[in-house]
Amino acid sequence: MAAKMKKGSLVRVIRAQLENSLEAQASDRRLPDYLFHSKGEVLDLNEEYALVRFYVPTPNVWLRLDQIEALA
């Protein structure tokens, strides 16, 4: 999946992967709806994470690559 992911890619969050993650368990479990019902854009990548911008007035967020999928 990481091979398909590049800067500027449009992505969506995989609900099951994010809700069951260690990161979600370590913080507030009430995740905002926009994460699952809107597209995000990859701004930056490293080996395990992608910096994703959603088109709502919120900060960008780092998500693991297995928690997002590229849109066709």
UniProtKB/Swiss-Prot annotation:
It is a peripheral membrane protein. It is found in: Cellular thylakoid membrane. Pfam families: NdhO. GO terms for molecular function: oxidoreductase activity, acting on NAD(P)H, quinone or similar compound as acceptor; quinone binding. Its EC number is 7.1.1.-. Keywords: Membrane, NAD, NADP, Plastoquinone, Quinone, Thylakoid, Translocase, Transport. It catalyses: a plastoquinone + NADH + (n+1) H(+)(in) = a plastoquinol + NAD(+) + n H(+)(out); a plastoquinone + NADPH + (n+1) H(+)(in) = a plastoquinol + NADP(+) + n H(+)(out). One of its GO terms (cellular component) is plasma membrane-derived thylakoid membrane. NDH-1 shuttles electrons from an unknown electron donor, via FMN and iron-sulfur (Fe-S) centers, to quinones in the respiratory and/or the photosynthetic chain. The immediate electron acceptor for the enzyme in this species is believed to be plastoquinone. Couples the redox reaction to proton translocation, and thus conserves the redox energy in a proton gradient. Cyanobacterial NDH-1 also plays a role in inorganic carbon-concentration. This is NAD(P)H-quinone oxidoreductase subunit O. It comes from Synechocystis sp. (strain ATCC 27184 / PCC 6803 / Kazusa). The lineage of its organism: Bacteria, Bacillati, Cyanobacteriota, Cyanophyceae, Synechococcales.
